[in-house]
A protein has these predicted regions:
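Juxtamembrane/disordered regions of integral membrane proteins
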Residues: 2-292
Length: 292
């Protein structure tokens, strides 16, 4: 994780942003119910009060994931809020629900639409709070690498395929430890056909790419810093927060998936940041005589 200032004021801002998120999560639940939309159903026996308390206690993780990105994202307050909200919504809300739709019985027919609406308010509120609490330290975006049109095409293709490749590799690495529980349908889990898994991850990757491109284009720091901060953010938004609160899942499954998602988040982030933000060889060669 990127270095974080050890100051009480920083901690207070993180906690406050987390409380804003938690408050709007509760409000969004009322809104979705009032609209008559379906919500995700927890497995039988799940302690909803324990889940709610864990969600509240874990809420500071979410601004802690976005703040390192926010401080190197130049632009107006509203623009920064918009791009952070889009990134958080796709990573934390939409793509997570798509994954839950195929790997569990909790997101039933109609619930995907309801949950997609549910996450709009809290993600927007979180982004506004983080953008306000953590102003940009970068005045302007770092220049994009100079590449030909064909160079950008294959790098965008690589950025699209990077997520499914990382996902499938690390999923395969831990499959022998978890697959039996999915086959047995433990606590609402399900195991879809491999064709469904691959097609879903290709679609999710397009959503990830669309949501992260504004951050990549506007990034005001070096590409390696982008990679580390994106990896940390995805780990929290996609896995860590949700698995901390998923008390209905077996503890060993939660731990294994936490490590798996952390590994593929950082691997994907480094591949994406390298593909889209690393300096071109031509630019590096041109800079060598000046350095000499």
């Amino acid at each position: 994780m990127p270095s974080i200032p050890r100051k009480p004021a920083f901690a207070a801002r993180i906690v406050l942003c987390g409380l804003v998120f938690a408050a709007f999560m509760s409000l969004s639940g009322f809104v979705v119910s009032a609209l008559g939309l379906k919500m995700m159903a927890l497995p039988d026996g799940a302690n909803q009060q324990a889940v709610a308390m864990a969600s509240l206690l874990a809420s500071p993780l979410l601004p802690l994931a976005l703040a390192p990105l926010a401080v190197l994202l130049p632009g107006t307050f509203l623009a920064r809020s918009l791009w952070l909200a889009l990134f958080a919504y796709v990573s934390f809300g939409l793509n997570t629900m798509i994954e839950a739709r195929i790997f569990s019985t909790m997101v039933g027919p109609g619930a995907l639409a309801g949950m997609s609406v549910f996450y709009v308010l809290p993600c927007c509120a979180l982004a506004l709070a983080v953008a306000a609490a953590f102003p940009a330290r970068a005045a302007r975006p770092a220049p994009l690498p100079g590449r030909t049109a064909s160079g950008w095409v294959w790098r965008l293709l690589l950025a699209w395929l990077a997520f499914p490749v990382c996902y499938l590799f690390f999923g395969w690495a831990i499959s022998s430890l978890v697959i039996e529980q999915y086959r047995r349908g433990v606590n609402g889990l399900a195991l879809p056909p491999i064709g469904v898994i691959v097609a879903t991850q290709l679609g999710r990757s397009l959503l990830y790419l669309a949501s992260v491109l504004p951050l990549v284009i506007l990034w005001g720091g070096p590409w390696r810093a982008l990679a580390v901060r994106l990896g940390w953010a995805w780990w929290v938004l996609v896995g860590l927060y949700g698995l901390i609160t998923a008390f209905w899942m077996p503890a060993n499954l939660r731990l294994i998936h936490t490590l798996e998602i952390g590994a593929d988040s950082f691997a994907y982030a480094f591949l994406l940041a390298w593909a889209l933000r690393a300096p071109s060889k031509r630019a590096a060669a041109a800079a060598m005589p000046h350095a000499a």
